[in-house]
């Protein structure tokens, strides 16, 4: 299965995400994708970015979900 990595800058997260609790943000992203679109993903973060690895064939669904929660 081919995957696509989506990278989001932490400093550009919307205000309703707590930038001081990145692990909670990652959990929220994973939960939204799983519950709303049945998409399993992998998330990680470093000091500057959040990385979301998703199946390439589900990229449109991922984008729709991320838009709904205010990330894109």
Go through each PLM region and give its residues.
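Generic structural motif
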Residues: 1-3, 34-43
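Residues in flexible loops and secondary-structure boundaries
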Residues: 16-18, 49, 60
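Short Gly/Ser/Thr- and Asp/Glu-enriched loop/turn motifs at secondary-structure junctions
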Residues: 43-49
């Amino acid at each position: 299965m081919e995957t696509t990595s989506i990278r989001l800058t932490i400093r550009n997260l919307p205000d309703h995400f707590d930038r001081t609790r990145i692990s909670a943000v990652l959990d929220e992203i994973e939960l939204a994708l799983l519950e709303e679109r049945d998409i399993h993903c992998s998330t990680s973060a470093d000091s500057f970015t959040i990385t979301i690895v998703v199946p390439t064939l589900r990229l449109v669904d991922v984008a729709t979900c991320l838009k709904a929660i205010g990330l894109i």
